[in-house]
Design a protein with these regions (language model features):
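A short SAM/SAH-binding and catalytic strip from SAM-dependent methyltransferases
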Residues: 85-97
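Conserved alpha-helix/loop element of class I SAM-dependent methyltransferases that forms part
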Residues: 5-21
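S-adenosyl-L-methionine-dependent methyltransferase catalytic module, highlighting the catalytic core
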Residues: 100-104, 111-171
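Conserved class I S-adenosyl-L-methionine
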Residues: 22-30
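Short conserved loop adjoining the S-adenosyl-L-methionine
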Residues: 74-80
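Alpha-helix C-terminal capping/helix-to-coil transition sites in glycosyltransferase folds
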Residues: 20, 81-82, 108
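Class I SAM-dependent methyltransferase SAM/SAH-binding core
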Residues: 33, 37-74
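Residues at the starts of beta-strands that form the adenosine-phosphate
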Residues: 23, 45, 111
Length: 171
Protein backbone atom coordinates (compact mmCIF):
# COMPACT_ATOMS: atom_id res chain seq x y z
CA UNK A 1 0.00 0.00 0.00
CA UNK A 2 1.43 3.38 -0.96
CA UNK A 3 1.90 5.99 1.75
CA UNK A 4 0.55 9.44 0.97
CA UNK A 5 4.13 10.56 0.31
CA UNK A 6 4.71 7.86 -2.32
CA UNK A 7 1.47 8.40 -4.24
CA UNK A 8 1.96 9.81 -7.72
CA UNK A 9 1.75 13.65 -7.47
CA UNK A 10 -1.63 13.88 -9.19
CA UNK A 11 -3.05 11.08 -7.02
CA UNK A 12 -1.79 12.83 -3.88
CA UNK A 13 -3.59 16.01 -4.98
CA UNK A 14 -6.78 14.04 -5.66
CA UNK A 15 -6.54 12.20 -2.32
CA UNK A 16 -6.27 15.54 -0.52
CA UNK A 17 -9.55 16.71 -2.08
CA UNK A 18 -11.63 13.65 -1.16
CA UNK A 19 -13.41 13.71 2.19
CA UNK A 20 -13.42 10.67 4.50
CA UNK A 21 -16.26 8.13 4.16
CA UNK A 22 -17.13 9.36 0.65
CA UNK A 23 -18.38 7.26 -2.26
CA UNK A 24 -15.76 7.33 -5.04
CA UNK A 25 -15.83 6.12 -8.64
CA UNK A 26 -12.33 5.90 -10.15
CA UNK A 27 -12.50 5.80 -13.95
CA UNK A 28 -9.40 4.40 -15.59
CA UNK A 29 -8.29 3.19 -12.16
CA UNK A 30 -5.26 1.28 -13.51
CA UNK A 31 -3.72 -0.79 -10.69
CA UNK A 32 -6.05 0.72 -8.07
CA UNK A 33 -3.35 2.66 -6.23
CA UNK A 34 -5.64 5.64 -5.48
CA UNK A 35 -8.67 3.58 -4.44
CA UNK A 36 -6.57 1.32 -2.21
CA UNK A 37 -5.05 4.35 -0.47
CA UNK A 38 -8.43 6.05 -0.06
CA UNK A 39 -10.07 2.93 1.35
CA UNK A 40 -7.22 2.36 3.79
CA UNK A 41 -6.73 5.95 4.91
CA UNK A 42 -10.05 7.72 4.38
CA UNK A 43 -12.54 4.88 4.73
CA UNK A 44 -14.10 5.58 1.33
CA UNK A 45 -16.41 3.19 -0.45
CA UNK A 46 -15.06 2.95 -3.96
CA UNK A 47 -15.43 1.28 -7.31
CA UNK A 48 -12.81 1.27 -10.02
CA UNK A 49 -13.47 1.01 -13.75
CA UNK A 50 -10.85 0.02 -16.30
CA UNK A 51 -10.75 -1.75 -19.64
CA UNK A 52 -7.34 -3.38 -19.16
CA UNK A 53 -7.39 -6.99 -17.89
CA UNK A 54 -4.07 -6.70 -16.03
CA UNK A 55 -5.33 -3.60 -14.22
CA UNK A 56 -8.49 -5.45 -13.22
CA UNK A 57 -6.44 -8.37 -11.87
CA UNK A 58 -4.22 -5.99 -9.88
CA UNK A 59 -7.29 -4.33 -8.34
CA UNK A 60 -8.90 -7.66 -7.46
CA UNK A 61 -5.65 -8.80 -5.82
CA UNK A 62 -5.84 -5.67 -3.65
CA UNK A 63 -9.41 -6.51 -2.66
CA UNK A 64 -10.92 -3.57 -4.54
CA UNK A 65 -14.35 -3.46 -6.16
CA UNK A 66 -13.63 -3.09 -9.87
CA UNK A 67 -15.54 -3.39 -13.12
CA UNK A 68 -14.03 -4.11 -16.51
CA UNK A 69 -15.78 -1.74 -18.90
CA UNK A 70 -15.18 0.65 -21.76
CA UNK A 71 -16.13 4.13 -20.54
CA UNK A 72 -16.47 5.41 -24.11
CA UNK A 73 -20.06 4.18 -24.23
CA UNK A 74 -21.02 5.96 -21.03
CA UNK A 75 -21.65 5.01 -17.44
CA UNK A 76 -25.17 3.66 -17.88
CA UNK A 77 -24.57 1.02 -15.17
CA UNK A 78 -24.55 3.75 -12.53
CA UNK A 79 -27.54 5.73 -11.28
CA UNK A 80 -27.64 9.52 -11.13
CA UNK A 81 -25.84 10.89 -8.08
CA UNK A 82 -24.44 7.49 -7.02
CA UNK A 83 -21.07 8.93 -5.99
CA UNK A 84 -19.68 11.89 -4.09
CA UNK A 85 -16.60 11.99 -6.33
CA UNK A 86 -15.84 10.68 -9.81
CA UNK A 87 -12.13 10.64 -10.65
CA UNK A 88 -10.60 10.52 -14.14
CA UNK A 89 -6.84 10.67 -13.68
CA UNK A 90 -4.42 10.69 -16.62
CA UNK A 91 -7.05 9.02 -18.81
CA UNK A 92 -9.02 11.74 -20.60
CA UNK A 93 -6.28 12.30 -23.21
CA UNK A 94 -6.74 8.71 -24.43
CA UNK A 95 -10.53 8.91 -24.82
CA UNK A 96 -12.45 9.59 -28.01
CA UNK A 97 -15.68 11.10 -26.66
CA UNK A 98 -14.49 13.48 -23.96
CA UNK A 99 -17.68 15.54 -23.79
CA UNK A 100 -19.77 12.41 -23.14
CA UNK A 101 -17.52 11.16 -20.35
CA UNK A 102 -17.52 14.59 -18.66
CA UNK A 103 -21.33 14.70 -18.82
CA UNK A 104 -21.56 11.17 -17.45
CA UNK A 105 -19.11 11.93 -14.65
CA UNK A 106 -21.28 14.81 -13.49
CA UNK A 107 -24.46 12.77 -13.88
CA UNK A 108 -23.30 9.96 -11.59
CA UNK A 109 -21.23 12.07 -9.20
CA UNK A 110 -21.51 15.30 -7.27
CA UNK A 111 -17.90 16.32 -7.98
CA UNK A 112 -15.74 15.41 -10.97
CA UNK A 113 -11.96 15.42 -10.60
CA UNK A 114 -9.91 15.28 -13.81
CA UNK A 115 -6.14 15.26 -14.25
CA UNK A 116 -4.27 15.10 -17.54
CA UNK A 117 -0.79 15.68 -18.93
CA UNK A 118 -0.49 19.42 -19.54
CA UNK A 119 1.19 19.72 -22.91
CA UNK A 120 1.53 23.48 -22.28
CA UNK A 121 3.84 22.88 -19.30
CA UNK A 122 7.17 24.57 -19.98
CA UNK A 123 9.21 21.34 -19.84
CA UNK A 124 6.94 19.75 -22.46
CA UNK A 125 7.16 22.85 -24.67
CA UNK A 126 10.94 22.83 -24.30
CA UNK A 127 11.13 19.22 -25.50
CA UNK A 128 9.06 20.14 -28.56
CA UNK A 129 11.23 23.23 -29.15
CA UNK A 130 14.33 21.04 -29.34
CA UNK A 131 12.59 18.68 -31.75
CA UNK A 132 11.38 15.89 -29.46
CA UNK A 133 7.92 14.78 -28.36
CA UNK A 134 7.61 15.12 -24.58
CA UNK A 135 8.38 12.10 -22.41
CA UNK A 136 8.04 12.50 -18.64
CA UNK A 137 6.52 10.92 -15.52
CA UNK A 138 3.02 11.95 -16.66
CA UNK A 139 3.72 11.30 -20.36
CA UNK A 140 5.73 8.07 -20.16
CA UNK A 141 5.23 6.93 -23.76
CA UNK A 142 7.24 7.50 -26.90
CA UNK A 143 5.36 9.15 -29.77
CA UNK A 144 4.99 5.84 -31.64
CA UNK A 145 3.40 3.79 -28.82
CA UNK A 146 1.31 6.31 -26.92
CA UNK A 147 -2.37 5.76 -26.11
CA UNK A 148 -2.75 9.55 -26.03
CA UNK A 149 -4.88 10.88 -28.87
CA UNK A 150 -5.57 14.37 -27.49
CA UNK A 151 -2.88 16.82 -26.48
CA UNK A 152 -4.29 19.69 -24.47
CA UNK A 153 -3.34 22.42 -22.04
CA UNK A 154 -5.12 23.68 -18.94
CA UNK A 155 -6.54 26.57 -21.02
CA UNK A 156 -7.85 24.13 -23.65
CA UNK A 157 -9.57 22.07 -20.96
CA UNK A 158 -11.03 25.17 -19.33
CA UNK A 159 -12.41 26.25 -22.72
CA UNK A 160 -14.06 22.83 -23.18
CA UNK A 161 -15.62 23.09 -19.73
CA UNK A 162 -16.94 26.55 -20.64
CA UNK A 163 -18.74 25.05 -23.65
CA UNK A 164 -20.51 22.65 -21.31
CA UNK A 165 -21.44 25.40 -18.84
CA UNK A 166 -18.89 24.23 -16.26
CA UNK A 167 -15.82 25.95 -14.94
CA UNK A 168 -12.42 24.92 -13.74
CA UNK A 169 -11.96 24.74 -9.99
CA UNK A 170 -8.38 24.37 -8.90
CA UNK A 171 -8.33 24.18 -5.10
Amino acid sequence: MASHQTLRPDLKHIADQIKPASRVLDLGCADGELLAWLQSNKNVRGIGVDVDVLSIVSCVEKGLNVIQADMESGLQHFEDGSFDYVVLSLTIQAMHNIELILQEMLRVGKVGIVTFPNFGFWENRLQILIGRMPVSETIPYEWYNTPNIHFCTVKDFDQLLGKTGRNLNDP
